[in-house]
Amino acid sequence: MNNNTTCIQPSMISSMALPIIYILLCIVGVFGNTLSQWIFLTKIGKKTSTHIYLSHLVTANLLVCSAMPFMSIYFLKGFQWEYQSAQCRVVNFLGTLSMHASMFVSLLILSWIAISRYATLMQKDSSQETTSCYEKIFYGHLLKKFRQPNFARKLCIYIWGVVLGIIIPVTVYYSVIEATEGEESLCYNRQMELGAMISQIAGLIGTTFIGFSFLVVLTSYYSFVSHLRKIRTCTSIMEKDLTYSSVKRHLLVIQILLIVCFLPYSIFKPIFYVLHQRDNCQQLNYLIETKNILTCLASARSSTDPIIFLLLDKTFKKTLYNLFTKSNSAHMQSYG
């Protein structure tokens, strides 16, 4: 048996806990996101740009959920499969493609939602005397586009096209070229977990994407706070407190999502690529375990998003409430 294979040994966390967690996340995520998509597509008549962003976010979430069974079976059976077996290739290709493509799409869409929420604030204040000429021009020529449903629809389609156009060739290259160059005997091995040169470069670019998304959200929140302070020193904003509170809540929710789910992953990934080059099997196993746990944490956001939608969109919350209220009323009447 190859040295690289024997060096990588899955712990109970990888072989037992992660498969169970991925299956549970898949069940919760498929149910919640399918219900959310049904509401967005059939129950909400007049769709705003936020609804379009959230609908595409749900699509990305469902794609992540579709990868979870592959990830689960990989961690459960990967140490028993042969490296060149069909099931190893299929799980590796579909799991990697679905997981990473949809994660990057989700990140970009969350960034656009943050910009859209800030644009809502600027729309409310673009006619105020306290708004600078720069802010009026910035809103008039750029920000307001993020609130236009047509622009939101086209932007989301472009995002899917660009991300898939990058991820698919990298995944195919890794599966066809890089994955066949190693001498590993088992599916769960060093090369599968670490990736080769091209896939590592792609991983670092992906980490940069996460940093970019986080920067966009932080910038939106900082701009919001700065704008709010300026407005408060110049005029009364009591009549607009609800709008400001709503925008602040949305930006905070997105910030928390990125901090909890994606920030640990993005911080650890460069460290992982630097430290894994040392010939220390115990340290390598710890690094791989940590990477897999943080990847699972990042993908968990896709399953919890339907709860987040209740905080991001009042129409979705109201529609869901009415749906369950009517359902309960009909159920009570049938027993009346």
Swiss-Prot record:
Main location: membrane
Subcellular location: Cell membrane
Single biological process term from Gene Ontology: triglyceride metabolic process
GO molecular function: G protein-coupled receptor activity
GO cellular component, one term: plasma membrane
Family: Belongs to the G-protein coupled receptor 1 family.
Protein name from the UniProt record: Probable G-protein coupled receptor 82
Organism ancestry: Eukaryota, Metazoa, Chordata, Craniata, Vertebrata
Gene: GPR82
